[in-house]
Amino acid sequence: MRARPSITVVCAAALVFLGGCATTSDPDTASVPASVTEGKKDMPPPVAAIADDPAAPVSLTLDGVTAPTDPVATDASGTLLPPQDVSRLGWWVDSAMPGGGSGAIVVTGHVDDVDQGDGFAARFADVREGDELTVSTGDGRAREYRVDRLLSVGNEGNLPLDEINRLDGPETLLLVTCGGEFVGPPLGYANNDFVFAVPTGPAAEVPAP
């Protein structure tokens, strides 16, 4: 298991990031995001990453709507940014792998943007326990997950740091974004929203288009 510092989740006005120690080439000491922030404008570009495993996520479907999902990594300062296109999501390459059987698969995205409007991650606020999501992976498979828990924590609240960072324990799809009322800088949104979903069965082959 990789050694990882804790994550602190903070909503801020100008950008979205998961921050932590800088990425290293050693997977046992890879960087771990320290925070998540959600923004309204002036979004810097993400750090593109390469998903070496074909089982990496390529899209996520929620309520019949699909968001392309890009691998993203931390930069030298430890910042992890979702795609600037708010219709897309970012899968943190240092989190768990779909179908791996353990750990948290961390997916994040922008709630909105002043120019683009609502982002795909805004849909996370409408998710309810029992809802189903589909993660399609690069090996041509679709993995189904069922939402089993929702959590919204104020910026001053206690965050589920162990659950966000873990690579062991039950496999969990963890969607992370900001929520609640937009309160302006420096906090941005009032809350941090989490959607926890568990696998419902084995992967299925994705039909050819």
Please give the residue ranges for each predicted region.
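N-terminal export and membrane-targeting signals
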Residues: 1-13
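C-terminal motif of bacterial Sec signal peptides marking the signal peptidase cleavage site
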Residues: 17-20
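Solvent-exposed, non-transmembrane regions of membrane-associated and secreted proteins
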Residues: 22-128, 137, 149-209
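Short, charged beta-turn/beta-strand-edge "cap" motif at the junction between a beta-strand
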Residues: 138-142
